[in-house]
């Protein structure tokens, strides 16, 4: 087995009938024996441990659910557990019944690829009946309050039409009352408009003849803008000047010049007196 250069190269297949030497053998992960390419599967070499991790699922005829059989357990016991605990016969119709197109005489089953929902009626249809005229679309759904409004309007119309047939005088009285209401509302609007116009005219006349200008500082009233300006210059400007009299002033020791800002005084001494501050 192998060659003089590689004595361990290749192994014989474990199947008694085969015993073929394979230079790339396969080792079974269950029985840990060596096999050739033709006998590498569990069924080909009849592996005694091949069903340990085997997954076998049986479809229940009552609920159409998958039942997984345990290799280390009797299938009858597994089936009894499913029937007693997890089996639901009502699920059979949901799982087996396929959805069809709602159009009469259409036998097309609706799947993921051939289903289109109508934007107006929100119902699923097949590709053949996807347009509204093909499936007699009733149109978009009406809102409930729209129906309430339409019913209320029909009731009002019925109430108004019934007395018209029985008593024509009542219809004339109702129309006259409506006209009177319209006239009264129009008169009220006109009176309000007249009051607003009169108020504006009074305000403009008071501007021309009365006291309209008010001082923002003391609240004094004046008949013209010029008098208001004179008042501000005489009274309030003087008060500002008097208040500014309390500001500290720094005096130059050489020329007795006053400065409000000490920085300006230092710059003046360095510029005019060449940096000397001798008295």
Swiss-Prot record:
Region listing for Disordered, in residue ranges: 152-178
Record InterPro entries: AN1-like_Znf (IPR035896), Znf_AN1 (IPR000058), Znf_C2H2_type (IPR013087)
Coiled-coil blocks: none
Zinc finger (AN1-type) residue numbers: 7-55, 95-145
Positions bound to Zn(2+) 1: 13, 18, 36, 39
Binding site for Zn(2+) 4: 118, 121, 135, 137
Keyword Metal-binding: yes
Low complexity bias spans: 169-178
GO molecular function terms noted in the UniProt entry: zinc ion binding
Keyword Iron annotated: no
Top-level taxon in the UniProt lineage: Eukaryota
Binding site for Zn(2+) 2: 28, 31, 45, 47
Mapped zinc finger ranges (C2H2-type): 213-236, 250-273
Keywords: Metal-binding, Repeat, Zinc, Zinc-finger
Binding site for Zn(2+) 3: 101, 106, 126, 129
Role noted for this protein: May be involved in environmental stress response.
Protein's name in the database: Zinc finger AN1 and C2H2 domain-containing stress-associated protein 11
Source organism per UniProt: Arabidopsis thaliana (Mouse-ear cress)
Top-level taxonomy: Eukaryota, Viridiplantae, Streptophyta, Embryophyta, Tracheophyta
